[in-house]
Structure formats: C-alpha cells, structure tokens
Amino acid sequence: MTQDELKKAVGWAALQYVQPGTIVGVGTGSTAAHFIDALGTMKGQIEGAVSSSDASTEKLKGLGIHVFDLNEVDSLGIYVDGADEINGHMQMIKGGGAALTREKIIASVAEKFICIADASKQVDILGKFPLPVEVIPMARSAVARQLVKLGGRPEYRQGVVTDNGNVILDVYGMEILDPIALENAINAIPGVVTVGLFANRGADVALIGTPDGVKTIVK
C-alpha cells in the first residue's frame, strides 16, 4: 500500500468513533482530508463540524457539512486529526500544515482526541521532524534567540502566514526527552502563540495505518 492509501485507511477507520447527531472536531492536513471525505458519507447523520483551518472548512462546506464556529459549541465528543510524529505516550508533534494553534484549541475542548496516522509517523523520541512554533510576527527574532538557548535551530518558514495572521518558526535539532517540560517552556516565551508539541493534551486513541491493516492504540 502507498502512504496515501494508508492515510485513507485510517481516515475512514475513524468514522467508527463518530456518533450520530453530534458535532465533530476536524483537523487539517492530508490524512485529515481523507477523514473529511469519509465524514461526507455521514453528513445527514451529524449536526456538523468544527474546523481547525480555512482549508478544512472549505472542504467540509464543499461536501455539504455545516461548519460551526467553536464559540457556538459547548462541547465536542471527538476531535480527529493527523500528526507529524507520535510517540508511545501518545504525545505528538503537529503543525507541518501551519494549523497548530487552532488544532490545539479544538483538541483541548474535545472529550476524545483521535490521532490518525500512517506507521511512518510513529517514533520512540519526538524531534526528528522539525518542531513548528507559531509566533507573533514582531517577536520572530526574539523568540528565535530563546529557542536557540533551549538547544534548537530555528528556521523561519518563508512565505507562510497562518490563518491567524502569524508566522512559523521550525525548530531543528531537538531530541525531545521531556515533551511536557519543553511544551511549557516554549509556550512561556513572550511572542509565542503556541508550539506544535501536543504533550499536555496528547491523543486518547491512535489509529495507525500499516500494510497489515489499521492498528488501534488506546491510551
């Protein structure tokens, strides 16, 4: 199976967690896009979705799924999204698609976070994938200096503006042995909107696409 076929398999497998009559939290990226396609087959059974990016909102609306503003929603049963890396503790690096802040907000509201990923995203130690940090534009250089002090090699993601109007620094060279401590340390830097470490709020269920089928890991 190709990588895209593995992503499709986990996207469709996540449908089993969707309850009729509910509002579904939806992530961003190539794997989440397959989940949105699958969700389209249930559009008459769900109330709608909350989306983590303009791109996902457009795709959901194109399939006829009503998209709610998060401010209109009291609670979410599930949030389904991909990951750039996921470790054995269900902690993740996310933000390759620059939607990390909205993803983290929706994940914090949802009762259950379901991570969908192909097996290549499983790692023992987070950090080989560059760690994205969303930053207020005027603070870019100041934040970068602080990230160097934390042992990273930040690079400005040229030409990318987030849906919130901010910029992204990708931090290379991090071997993240204590993801919660690093998430807290980076989030404490003035000018950081959020870091793409999902350690304090990790996944509850991981659906991993393998050549032998979809593997389910429960926290």
From Swiss-Prot:
Substrate binds at residues 28-31, 81-84, 94-97, 121. The keyword Isomerase applies. It holds the Pfam family Rib_5-P_isom_A. GO terms for cellular component: cytosol. The keyword Isomerase applies. One of its GO terms (molecular function) is ribose-5-phosphate isomerase activity. One of its GO terms (biological process) is D-ribose metabolic process. This is Ribose-5-phosphate isomerase A. HAMAP family: Rib_5P_isom_A.
